[in-house]
Amino acid sequence: MSSLKKILGLKGKGKKSKKLGIAPPPYEEDTSMEYAPSAPIDKSYFGVDEMDTHDPNQLRYEKFFFTVKMTVRSNRPFRTYSDVAAAVSHWDHMYIGMAGKRPFYKILAFLGSSNLKATPAVLADQGQPEYHAHCEGRAYLPHRMGKTPPMLNVPEHFRRPFNIGLYKGTIELTMTIYDDESLEAAPMIWDHFNSSKFSDFREKALMFGLIVEKKASGAWVLDSVSHFK
């Protein structure tokens, strides 16, 4: 977790990252990525004696580098951004990947969808509509999801079909996100969105399984991730 001083670009003396460079689990590991215990975790279990307790009211800041490359192929042109979001939000159906990065990947998929541009028809594969987006940079995310695991510089690729109403096609996503431990200031991740595509930000975020709330300052905060999307 990046401290607020690092987010704002303020130097601190003797401040070291608490994150460990632990290798991520194998990408091919086929296991359930959803875990929601119904009772307090027994502290006698291995590895939980020093586990960070998740306080849903505690605001944290995560600073990172990111890259997202997206290609969407559809059987017909999308009419509105709502059509785009309905299709792209299925990218993590039957998700197999790094569990700790999934909430951040949801944000990057949402971000990429807002920056999609249509490929000229003459260049489209077999004459079918294609859309592309490529976004990268540095950003920070205010959130209430508890302590996040170390995020290493490991790209992941996803390819999923979609069949939503009149639209059928495929989504291809390559995403990379890793910790930024520098002292340089960074913009909020929401600043990288093309907000001209939509006005109902909270509703569109929920389509990607992101539950966001607005602070008194007007900034959006990721409160949690929906288990139903």
Curated annotation (Swiss-Prot):
* SUPFAM superfamilies per record: VSV matrix protein (SSF75404)
Cite the source lineage: Viruses, Riboviria, Orthornavirae, Negarnaviricota, Haploviricotina
Q: Per the record, what about its domains?
A: Late-budding domains (L domains) are short sequence motifs essential for viral particle budding. They recruit proteins of the host ESCRT machinery (Endosomal Sorting Complex Required for Transport) or ESCRT-associated proteins. M contains two overlapping L domains: a PPXY motif which interacts with the WW domain 3 of NEDD4 and a PTAP/PSAP motif, which interacts with the UEV domain of TSG101.
Source organism: Vesicular stomatitis Indiana virus (strain 85CLB South America) (VSIV)
| Family indicated by similarity | Belongs to the vesiculoviruses matrix protein family.
Report the PTM annotation.
Answer: Phosphorylated by host.
* Name of the protein in its database record: Matrix protein
What's any GO biological process attached to this entry? viral budding via host ESCRT complex
Biotechnological applications: VSV is used as an oncolytic agent for cancer therapy, because of his wide host range, rapid replication and mild pathogenicity in humans. VSV used are mutated at M51R in their matrix protein. These mutated viruses cannot successfully infect normal cells, being unable to counteract the antiviral state induced by interferon-alpha in normal cells. Cancer cells are impeded with responsiveness to interferon, and then can be successfully infected and lysed by the virus.
GO molecular function annotation: structural constituent of virion
Q: Where is this motif: PPXY motif?
A: 24-27
What is the primary gene name for this protein?
A: M
User: Highest taxon of the source?
Assistant: Viruses
User: Quaternary structure per UniProt?
Assistant: Homomultimer. Interacts with viral nucleocapsid; this interaction contributes to the virion assembly. Interacts with the viral envelope glycoprotein; this interaction contributes to the virion assembly. Interacts with host RAE1-NUP98 complex. Interacts with host NEDD4 and TSG101. Interacts with host dynamin. Interacts with host NDUFAF4; the interaction inhibits viral propagation and is independent of interferon activation. Interacts with host GTF2H5; the interaction may inhibit host transcription.
- List where the motif PTAP/PSAP motif lies: 37-40
What would be one Pfam family of this protein?
Vesiculo_matrix
